[in-house]
């Protein structure tokens, strides 16, 4: 789905992505650490991966922090605009057209048919991924089909990582996270 946003004179939008609330490697551990992003803007565009919404050990913590962050936005009078990423494919919009389409924003996962060809999800599920790609031949030339492929791939290929404190072996944890995100 495409979302449109036209800013009125004096309104400002700030763009961020890949916050990954709940994930062990997230740089911002708590939503309050990002309060400064809400200063001086009327809209905050999150270009995917605010938190993990797929079934995973990180989901519950990520959703709780996501809700707190969105509450912070509302309290600051900032309108959040959430776009789908590979970790939150259930967000409604995959593409934002700003100012009548002169500016477009999306999460980078749609740039690759494999979503993240360097990631564990693809490496552990190559056959399923290849079958999905074959089912979307129009995705080569049609952006909306590419976004649909990316969303489908993100939903059907399960996440492969752990949250902080859930993995005993530090070497294995390091190796599992070496291909972040």
Task: List each model region and its residues.
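Extended recognition/assembly regions associated with phosphoester-bond processing machinery
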Residues: 1-181
């Amino acid at each position: 789905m495409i979302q449109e946003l036209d800013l009125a004179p004096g309104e400002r939008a700030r763009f961020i992505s890949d916050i990954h609330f709940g994930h062990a490697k997230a740089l911002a551990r708590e939503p309050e650490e990002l309060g400064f992003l809400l200063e001086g803007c009327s809209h905050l565009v999150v270009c995917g991966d605010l938190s993990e919404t797929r079934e995973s050990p990180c989901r519950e913590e990520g959703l709780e922090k996501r809700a707190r962050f969105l509450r912070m936005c509302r309290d600051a009078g900032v309108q959040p605009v959430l776009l789908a990423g590979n970790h939150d494919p259930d967000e409604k919009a995959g593409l934002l057209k700003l100012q009548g389409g002169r500016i477009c924003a999306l999460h980078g996962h749609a740039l690759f048919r494999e979503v993240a060809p360097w990631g564990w999800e693809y490496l552990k599920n190559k056959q399923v991924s290849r079958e999905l790609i074959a089912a979307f031949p129009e995705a080569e030339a049609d952006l909306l089909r590419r976004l649909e492929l990316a969303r489908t791939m993100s939903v059907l290929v399960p996440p492969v990582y752990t949250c902080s404190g859930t993995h005993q072996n530090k070497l294995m944890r390091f190796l599992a996270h070496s291909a972040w995100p």
